[in-house]
Amino acid sequence: MNMTEYDQAIIALYEHPGNNCAKPSNIAGAMLKTSLTNVDRNTSFTVTWSLPDFSAQAVLSCSINAHAHETAVIINFERGAIKIPSPIFCPKEFIVQRHGQVMQEERKSYEYTGGGWHFQADEVARCLRDGKRESSLWGHDKSLLQMEIFDEVTLGLSILEHAIEIIVGSSSGRLFATLRS
């Protein structure tokens, strides 16, 4: 699974002031694997926050064999949308569209050299220089949450694959299984 689309969801939803950095209430996913290496080729997953004061959902997908759409990220809100063009790992602009009787659009563009990874390297260098063990921009909580989400998606899929193998090998034709939700 790719991490870049996850980053946008965390910035928009996990860090949203109304969420107060609460973990998602539900994670679901689907994956197609390559026949050659059995690694994920296409993965889609949904991360849902369903809290009394904050409800939001991220629908994410990544692929190693299909090109990204021109608009890599669309974040819809009640009063507008933020659109981030491809490539998702190195966007050089974003567009804010406000909904209303006359839709307003604001475009912000940035110029920099490289593929975008230097931002992470610069942050690591700043942390090392300052003696920090954790970045204030992307703390351990976000990395651990990412691992939990990815584990949940892959665990759910491996349980499903195992259940399918049992069905194929079953002589009684009946299977009762409980999948963790």
Language-model-detected regions and their locations in the chain:
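Soluble or luminal CAZymes and related metallo-dependent hydrolases
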Residues: 2, 116, 142
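Contiguous beta-strand/loop segments that form the cofactor/metal-binding neighborhood of enzyme cores
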Residues: 2-90, 124-127, 151, 169-179
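Generic anion/oxyanion-binding catalytic loop in active/binding sites
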Residues: 34, 113, 132
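C-terminal helix-rich "cap/oligomerization" subdomain common to oxidoreductases
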Residues: 50, 123-181
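Active-site oxyanion/phosphate-handling segment shared across diverse enzymes
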Residues: 86-89, 95-99, 117
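Surface-exposed loop/edge segments in extracytoplasmic proteins
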Residues: 102-106
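Active-site loop of classical SDR/Rossmann-like NAD(P)-dependent oxidoreductases
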Residues: 109-122, 138
